[in-house]
């Protein structure tokens, strides 16, 4: 899980690089740059870099950068992969925390709300399930962004008219994933405890056939 998160962090950083290195400014309407100072885009990128501490670069081809938003589609793809990683981890935690009587119950999830009155001891895995719902939303945003970059929907000849929708969906995904990462750590992982007696029994049962074979 830790390595999966490390790779997710690198993917998120790659998403930012994909956007910052292809700034479509200075190309005016369709990428010609007509009636604009030839250094306008580069100077804006430099000022943004100085102000935000992020390395920005003017697009090397304004026709491509303004007719398509492939870098946004690429960045969203990285975020979609992060969302899939969140789903895997959250779902595993949900199953390992199921119980106490009818599930695995290998870990004790922290209770963040009242449990069920008809199932004593059961902790509802609401934090895990919240993370999974966010992941579904991010994957939906990714589809919307992909459609926005598709010819006939957003990309029309020299222009892409779906940039507002693509930007809104991308920012939504970034905010959701960021908040969900904090929520998983603070409300789930920090209070998670291994159920040692149950794990010991499971380990004994799993290794019994091996011992018998020996």
Predicted regions located by residue number:
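Long, amphipathic alpha-helical stalk/connector segments used for oligomerization, subunit docking
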Residues: 137-200
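Internal glycine-rich alpha/beta core junctions
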Residues: 1-145
């Amino acid at each position: 899980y830790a390595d999966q998160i490390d790779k997710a962090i690198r993917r998120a950083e790659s998403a930012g690089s994909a956007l910052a290195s292809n700034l479509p400014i200075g190309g005016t309407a369709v990428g010609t740059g007509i009636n604009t100072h030839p250094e306008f885009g580069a100077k804006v990128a430099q000022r943004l870099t100085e102000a935000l501490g992020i390395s920005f670069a003017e697009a090397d081809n304004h026709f491509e950068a303004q007719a398509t938003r492939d870098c946004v589609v690429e960045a969203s793809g990285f975020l979609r992969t992060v969302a899939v990683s969140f789903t895997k981890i959250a779902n595993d935690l949900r199953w390992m925390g199921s119980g106490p009587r009818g599930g695995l119950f290998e870990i004790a999830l922290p209770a963040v709300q009242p449990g069920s009155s008809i199932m004593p001891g059961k902790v509802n895995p609401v934090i895990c399930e919240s993370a999974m719902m966010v992941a579904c939303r991010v994957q939906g945003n990714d589809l919307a962004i992909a459609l926005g970059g598709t010819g006939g929907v957003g990309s029309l000849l020299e222009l892409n008219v779906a940039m507002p929708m693509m930007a809104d969906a991308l920012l939504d995904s970034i905010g959701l994933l960021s908040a969900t990462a904090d929520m998983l750590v603070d409300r789930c992982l920090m209070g998670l405890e291994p159920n040692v007696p149950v794990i010991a029994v499971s380990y004994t049962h799993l290794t019994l056939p091996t011992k018998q074979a020996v």
